Amino acid sequence: MSIILGIDPGSRITGYGVIRQNGRHLYYLGSGCIRTSEKELPGRLKQIYAGVSEIITQFQPDVFAIEQVFMSKNADSALKLGQARGSAIVAAVNADLPVHEYAARLIKQAVTGNGGADKSMVQNMVMSMLKLPAKPQADAADALGVAITHANTNKTLVALAGKATGARKGRYR
């Protein structure tokens, strides 16, 4: 059993989602958004760090998963997003959590079966997969998607590791 904290980073709104993985089953523990109020970026980064640190203290996750930065046409936006990610990652590292990163396309593929899915599709699938009574906020749904992706990726890697022997069989050696 492990608790996974997923993060959808943003310099204004950072989504978070926490799930518990018990074997093949996933259970919803909590989600929401860290909304920054500061006008200047350094103040927003401080709020992201403090918010993620508080979530880590509250839920005591075993692992931290975060969405990777995608290249944007707007370099300034991409840089701010990278700094927001950095603030969240530092909070995880300070709590001695292992950090895993996933591309947005992989997350959408893992959750909806379509790497080009829109936010509404992700929200609907997250709601269905975690048996939520209502559609989560878009940023929180994305963060839950990050956590689900890690749970499913980790499950696959563990299964493969159990079957791998390192020896090849057959006529080609």
UniProtKB/Swiss-Prot annotation:
Assembly and oligomerization: Homodimer which binds Holliday junction (HJ) DNA. The HJ becomes 2-fold symmetrical on binding to RuvC with unstacked arms; it has a different conformation from HJ DNA in complex with RuvA. In the full resolvosome a probable DNA-RuvA(4)-RuvB(12)-RuvC(2) complex forms which resolves the HJ.
Cofactor binding: number and manner: Binds 2 Mg(2+) ion per subunit.
Catalytic residues identified in the record: 8, 67, 139
Residues given in the record as Mg(2+) 2 binding sites: 67
Originating organism: Vibrio atlanticus (strain LGP32)
UniProt keyword annotation of Transmembrane present: no
Name under which the protein is recorded: Crossover junction endodeoxyribonuclease RuvC
GO molecular function terms attached to this record: crossover junction DNA endonuclease activity; DNA binding; magnesium ion binding
Key words, A-Z: Cytoplasm, DNA damage, DNA recombination, DNA repair, DNA-binding, Endonuclease, Hydrolase, Magnesium, Metal-binding, Nuclease
UniProt lineage: Bacteria, Pseudomonadati, Pseudomonadota, Gammaproteobacteria, Vibrionales
